[in-house]
Amino acid sequence: MTTHYIAGNWQAGQGETLQSLNPVTQAVIWQGQGADASQVDTAVQAARQAFPAWAQLSLEARIDVLEKFAAQLKVHAEAMAQCIGEETGKPLWESATEVTSMINKVAISVQSYRERTGEKSGPLADATAVLRHKPHGVVAVFGPYNFPGHLPNGHIVPALLAGNCVVFKPSELTPKVAELTVNCWIAAGLPAGVLNLVQGARETGVALAANPGIDGLFFTGSSRTGNLLHQQFAGRPDKILALEMGGNNPLVVDEVKDLDAAVYTIVQSAFISAGQRCTCARRLLVPQGAWGDALIARLVEVCKTITVGAFDEQPAPFMGSVISLQAARALLAAQVELAAKGGVKLLEMTQPQADAALLTPGIVDVTAVADRPDEEFFGPLLQVIRYGDFDAAIDEANNTQYGLAAGLLSDSRARYQYFWLRSRAGIVNWNKQLTGAASSAPFGGVGASGNHRASAYYAADYCAYPVASLETASLALPATLTPGVTL
């Protein structure tokens, strides 16, 4: 089966056998062999050969290809949404919004490039100061499974726009979405070698990250893998490394007037995408006392009614499945571990079908757990922590190695300003779900959550590097020579 797109040609893999399964039915929806190290190297060489011509194209010519790609996505939007839903398990309504985000990424990236990079100049007494930006060359893009179209797209589009060539390794759990995306690029007229697709799991990823022919690597995914990449790139300052990773995100709740609005925002923060967004709330900080008790009781009551089902089920469920049976089992095991440490299951997460990766929402009160794990439980598992005063809540919110997203639900602007100033996170929201983000804003965090602001408006910053120049059209002696020099 032809699973890799290298130098403008589809070819079969020579590495390990791979399968992609529908996470609910376990039906095989894609199969092939991963790329081995030699195929990865061929892909890198193809990108290197294509780089000079692609980089020398005018910006408008590259924009034209990107806009044709967006047009192809529109043509194939329904098929793309179906593919995303089938492979990830997310409901069709959510898959459709992902395709829309992919389409919109082109215009956002063009605007970002013009405003944050591009070319600027200013006159000096005897020359012109010019600032231009140059592409790095060949970059690797590693994509995640939770948004297999949108998140890799957030690296690939700005990278190509800046003049780079790309070797793309998607998650081994979502190869079909990657294949369909690359076909849209081919139909858009992208020249051979500018974008190369290598499918595979760990073996392929290690080979690509270690290949000396890449000039950088752009990664969105787990902190564990990102940390390994960071260690691997240590001592390689000549390589650009952009990491967007996960978070153990806190959502602090103040005593607000509208209890149901708070509950709805918590649900949208913790359980949308079956909890498989890197900005999902993992820790819910609730005040001690009667009001907090009422909030938790209402939250549990509402979460019991959340519908969970297959991606194409009608009427549409709020939550689809998690990515795989393995992921579902790991989350159930995490719930057991929290309970063993002293956590109280306020709402037990369950697996309605043993052979399907469907999970119901789980809520565990871990206030009494002394050694709470600072981990990202990537699914519908929410930990509740009760707090006595606002400063204690902020301290607990910051009690993590991560720093991706944090939020406050409060009727007080002064409290929010106090919270914002003390929060250690790259995204801080007020009375909005943690999973909400504007495409025109930077997306990313601090600490173990990453470095650059990947996959958003600020992606232009790491897709090209600035070059400062002093320029004049003719060479001439200055009117006054430097002391000590005679001509």
Curated annotation (Swiss-Prot):
Q: Where, in this chain's numbering, is NAD(+) bound?
A: 221-226
Active site: which residues?
244, 278
Q: What is its EC number?
A: 1.2.1.71
Q: Per its UniProt record, what InterPro entries does this chain match?
A: Ald_DH/histidinol_DH, Ald_DH_C, Ald_DH_CS_CYS, Ald_DH_CS_GLU, Ald_DH_N, Aldehyde_DH_dom, SuccinylGlu_semiald_DH_AstD
Report which superkingdom the organism of origin falls in: Bacteria
Class of this enzyme? oxidoreductase
Per its record, the protein catalyses: N-succinyl-L-glutamate 5-semialdehyde + NAD(+) + H2O = N-succinyl-L-glutamate + NADH + 2 H(+)
Q: Which UniProt keywords apply?
A: Arginine metabolism, NAD, Oxidoreductase
Q: Does the keyword rRNA-binding apply?
A: no
Main role?
Catalyzes the NAD-dependent reduction of succinylglutamate semialdehyde into succinylglutamate.
Instruction: Report what the protein is called.
Output: N-succinylglutamate 5-semialdehyde dehydrogenase
Q: Which species is listed as the source?
A: Pseudomonas putida (strain ATCC 700007 / DSM 6899 / JCM 31910 / BCRC 17059 / LMG 24140 / F1)
- List the top taxonomic levels of the source: Bacteria, Pseudomonadati, Pseudomonadota, Gammaproteobacteria, Pseudomonadales
> Coding gene?
astD
